[in-house]
A protein has these predicted regions:
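Extracellular glycoside hydrolase catalytic/binding regions
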Residues: 41-44, 68, 72, 78-81, ...
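Short catalytic/ligand-binding loop motif for oxyanion handling, primarily in non-cytosolic enzymes
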Residues: 14-17, 73-75, 105-107, 158-160
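Well-ordered, non-membrane alpha-helical segments in soluble/globular domains
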Residues: 27-51, 77-87, 129-138, 160-174, ...
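Glutamate identity and glutamate-enriched acidic tracts
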Residues: 29, 35, 50, 61, ...
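Aromatic-lined carbohydrate-binding surfaces of glycoside hydrolases
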Residues: 1-50, 63, 68-73
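Substrate-binding cleft of secreted/luminal carbohydrate-active enzymes
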Residues: 103-105, 117-195
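A structural motif corresponding to the C-terminal end of an alpha-helix
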Residues: 1-3, 48-61, 85-94, 141-147, ...
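Structural preference for beta-strand elements that scaffold enzyme active sites
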Residues: 2-8, 60-66, 93-97, 117-119, ...
């Protein structure tokens, strides 16, 4: 058995105008230019895949790439860039997936951006004032949009009953609203959990 892992792909921020030279032409890439962003992503993917190949991991396997930003602005540049990243990952035999926050900008267009999979976060577990209805609403949205779900656990769930009960609501919601079957699950474990 090999544990499958995904590498994050970060958004080349347009305000980064001196990224560095990634293609050996002696000119630093400018992230405010689409063509330079395309070069940066190509360089990053090639570097990641080369490292992965040379490492010859025995027990882990690169399964794909993860778009790190949890929301997408509606600009034409974002649309072009994310589609280009999805195309570049597909050309290399990998998928690109996304985990947006609850009802984030871009959620309803996730497939148009080229993501193979998108798993929405209900964002219920971390804030005690977030209503339980987020769980059902998230389940309804992911069904309607053909998405998947992220199940989250707070580090406080191990020491504070209120956070533990919130985590259990995710699990119960999966039974009540059907996302425990026939749906991909992503899991977010707060970095403070299990320390």
């Amino acid at each position: 058995y090999k544990f499958k892992y995904y590498l994050s792909v970060y958004y080349p921020r347009p305000d980064t105008t001196n990224f560095g030279d990634v293609d050996g032409d002696g000119v630093s890439e400018d992230c405010s230019k689409f063509e330079d962003c395309r070069k940066i992503i190509k360089w990053y993917l090639d570097l990641a895949l080369e490292y992965n190949k040379n490492a010859a991991f025995k027990n882990i396997e690169l399964a794909g790439f993860y778009w790190f930003d949890e929301a997408i602005d509606s600009s034409e540049n974002s649309y072009k860039l994310i589609n280009n990243i999805a195309d570049q990952t597909k050309e290399r035999g990998y998928d690109l997936f996304w985990i947006p926050y609850y009802c984030a900008p871009g959620v309803s267009e996730w497939a148009e951006y080229g993501f193979a999979t998108a798993c929405m976060q209900p964002n219920y577990v971390f804030n005690l004032t977030t209503p339980l209805s987020n769980i059902k609403n998230a389940a309804d949205i992911i069904k309607r949009l053909g998405m998947c779900i992220e199940i989250e656990i707070s580090g406080d769930a191990l020491s504070k009953d209120a956070y533990y009960r919130r985590y259990l609501e995710y699990l119960k919601g999966g039974i009540y609203y059907g996302y425990m079957k026939d749906c991909i699950h992503m899991y977010y474990q707060d970095t403070l959990a299990y320390n």
